[in-house]
């Protein structure tokens, strides 16, 4: 996988910046966004599904981009099918491989999306670790990664 595509993912996903939410793109069901993501990143997702993305562990930016690709873009590209969640286990493995290296370097909404697979997993051990990381973020930075609600 071409690691230069990591910048494309981050530029697209965080087009409003790392500290400005884009909840419509991120969390609202939209056929337009789904189709746009599939057109721009569908082939890249297929490569990642073949296990070609582990070189993306080498930088914080490529780490975050690969998580977004597997966790978020899968949900957009495969929306409405069982395949929406087929990359969850591979994504969780990838998150775990880089979490200790990058968790303190994550800025703004990067943390939220690097953290999101812990919320999506059905594995209880990972859920407990995610809960711990969630509360640790509050202690370190004074707020929760998703806001203080």
Specify the residue positions occupied by each region the protein language model found.
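Intrinsically disordered, low-complexity activation-like regions
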Residues: 1-80, 85-149
């Amino acid at each position: 996988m071409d690691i230069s595509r990591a910048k494309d993912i981050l530029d697209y996903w965080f087009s409003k910046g790392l500290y400005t939410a884009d909840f419509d793109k991120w969390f609202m069901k939209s056929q337009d966004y789904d189709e746009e993501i599939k057109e721009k990143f569908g082939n890249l997702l297929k490569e990642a599904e073949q296990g070609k993305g582990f070189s993306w562990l080498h930088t914080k930016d490529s780490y975050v981009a690969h998580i977004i690709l597997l966790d978020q873009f899968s949900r957009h590209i495969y929306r409405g099918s069982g395949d929406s969640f087929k990359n969850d286990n591979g994504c969780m493995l990838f998150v775990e491989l880089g979490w200790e290296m990058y968790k303190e370097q994550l800025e703004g909404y990067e943390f939220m999306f690097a953290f999101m697979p812990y919320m999506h997993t059905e594995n209880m051990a990972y859920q407990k670790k995610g809960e711990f990381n969630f509360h640790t973020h509050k202690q370190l930075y004074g707020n929760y990664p998703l806001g203080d609600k």
